[in-house]
Amino acid sequence: MPSKIFVKGARENNLKNIDVEIPRDALTVITGLSGSGKSSLAFDTIYAEGQRRYVESLSSYARMFLGQKEKPDVDYIEGLSPAISIDQKTTSQNPRSTVGTVTEVYDYLRLLWARVGTPHCPNCGKEIRQQSIDQIIDQLMALGEGTRVQIMAPVIRGKKGEHVKIFEDARRSGYVRVRADGNMYDLSEEISLEKNKKHNIEVVIDRLILRPDVVHRLTDSCETAAALSGGLILANILPDDRDILFSQNYACEDCGVSIEELTPRMFSFNNPFGACPTCTGLGTQLKVDPDLVIPNKSVSLLDGAICASGWNNVRGDGISRMYFDALSKKYHFSLRDPVEKLPKEVMDVILYGTKGEKLELQYDQPRGKGVLYQAFEGVIPNLERRYKETQSDGVREELEACMSECPCPTCGGKRLRRESLAVTVGDLSISDYCEKSVVDALDFVDQLTLTDQQMRIGERILKEIKNRLGFLRSVGLEYLTLSRASASLSGGEAQRIRLATQIGSSLMGVLYILDEPSIGLHQRDNDKLLATLKRLRDLGNTLIVVEHDEDTMRAADYLIDIGPGAGAHGGQVVAAGTPQEVMANPNSLTGQYLSGKKKIEVPKTRRAGNGSFLTVRGAQENNLKDLDVSVPLGTFTCVTGVSGSGKSSLVNEIIYKKLGADLNRMKVHPGRCKAIEGEEFLDKVICIDQSPIGRTPRSNPATYTNLFNDIRDLFASTPDAKARGYGPGRFSFNVRGGRCEACSGDGQLKIEMHFLPDIYVPCEVCKGKRYNRETLEVRYKGKSIADVLEMTVEEALEFFRDLPKLEAKLRTLSEVGLGYIRLGQSSTTLSGGEAQRVKLATELSKRSTGRTIYILDEPTTGLHTDDVKKLLEVLQRLVDAGNTVLVIEHNLDVIKCADYLLDLGPEGGSGGGTLVTCGTPEAVAACGASYTGQYLKKMLR
């Protein structure tokens, strides 16, 4: 086996025909400026080729489902192993996915609870024991004389297949009827079941009417049913077709409640045998929220206080107005009064209806006048009914804007049915155990006391649970609970969970490619992560990590610096070798920062702010412990703390959502707090995150920044365009008229290949230019609209230098370090850091009011130290204009440049949620109790 991976002639995206050697069974870090080509090399070339070769070895039928990747633009790659990509874009959005299910810990927990769990009665809580035939007979006879009963044997419960043999065996044994999936069949007829669906099948043993003289016959029938089904007896009570399940295995002596033998599927919320029947295992239900139906209580009904689909036209003369006129007349209130001044009884009637009491509705229409007598359904029941009845995704989406998730009333958010929640191990249900953090869950397992028999059964299961929980702790995720929804995890957390899962799999000879695993991780936990990466390497694997973190780069066996610039100015190997060799290379920008020759300077002064504060009182969201904090306005404030300390809960859930609801009229549910003071000093809140600036290839930097509108206006003002009667719309590739209709303005056509990846080919008509011939004939300074879209920001800045409006927007894009991107570059090809800087440039180009608060969550994700320097310059400019910048960050270069710090902690999860210290970076560095301060002290020397 070769000792290196050889990449020859890589040309994917902006890579300039580069050759790279990567040592096998080593930790290699690829670094460079944002947009320099790191991901193009690691993911789009090496991973894509490794994955493609693996998928190519499968059958054509399997390839159709796996979505084969096309061959990357590279001459050849030697020494490749099967590749596993662990990036930040694969966080599951499935509401059924949790930390426990993703790490497979929950699979072992289900097995543990099924094998050594103690069942209890869900009604009285008493421990359940096996039920004898005599007890079953007594319960059936208690139904009363004359009751008609069918005794059935449940032979198949929730299993796929046609089950032909089951029917044949029942027929040979002399049985006449079976019930399959709730339908009764005669065994003399042909019974056909779908092979790929789960089925329930019961054999009818006997049909009888309960009387004292049938006890012996009933006993025989029950014994036969139990023997046939393995201890289960199903009594079908006629004529109301009600089923009662009895088990020889477990039943409550007092309540008579039976449960089947404990199996792992009983504890799965993704299986109908374990999931709560009300919420089907989601743990939550969407309910219409009165606060979202009427978000602004200071507005009157007549002025549109009700912001719900179908209820916006109270001012008109439709059916809504008729109802509200009748309500105001009957309950004596004015439609012009603000909602907050209406009595509670009136609001209850408006929201929940008249409960069947009829109103006098007067109508006056062209067809005549009259009176109708109808009950008022109520706004909330009306919205809930329409949500259940609609078949339209659009209508459902509209209605969901007025709904919020709340815990399921049946299971209380625990996802499982009552019988499953009544099974305990060490006095805890499986749901209660999953509410514990990883570190508490480990302590519980270590202290668990079992009988000798239970220990023999559960020993191996407990070992697997401990191992997986230990791996989660080793990657700095000890604060997460096993019940935490995967969709709520940050990109860094999700990536480290997948990393922990891979360690648990103990694979050897694999190529792992990771994308910034240190994101969201406090400096304190970085050593744990590095130890984990080295452990994965020492198992006999090759690791390629795209990373900007200095500690990770220093710990690497091999370092590759891609650059020298970004975009068209990048795509070359600037330096490669050990970290020491890269530091000694004068051409490497990364090496200069690593060696200390270049660094981000600490500001000479700190702003004190404008004298006003935004104060949060009694913050209690998630793990926040009745927290009071103040953000000085007119400053660059950074919220710090170890992972899981409550930073996102404070900033994103409380501050952003509360200000968004009050200042921006957003329909959101702010996190729990007693009050927020100081909103009157702000006029809007803007969250600048790393989400894409558009979801389709049609979106690009020019359209997002509104630069394209100005460019289209410019082309429409040319003499040629005026002579032809072309307006700005002619130069849009999104509407008919000027665009190429052969490709609908996409510039390319998608060819479906079925067993191969889809191919995108340039449109033969417009040659990829998006516009028709007539539109392209209109030119400004000799360039067509398509030529302008192909320009980089730098080229466009020179081209439009005599047009102040265009020049100003282009200059801000250049100042945030995006001079290399093309104006028409598809937004889907931009990295998270690039998308964030496009948003920042858009904000910078707007006229500042000086009363805006900008919120950023880890803005340094994907940014090189040199990019961080540019980002800080932009953020400082926003603050210099009188605005407030509030940032969640772990990057010490950003933290040391802030005016004010709020350090949360001291630990993550239940050990966090308090304010450790606050003040200038120097004040925080002087606090011995602050983990952030300990690392910050070294940076301020």
Regions found by a protein language model. Name each.
Residues 1-941:
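Conserved phosphate-binding elements of NTP-dependent enzyme cores
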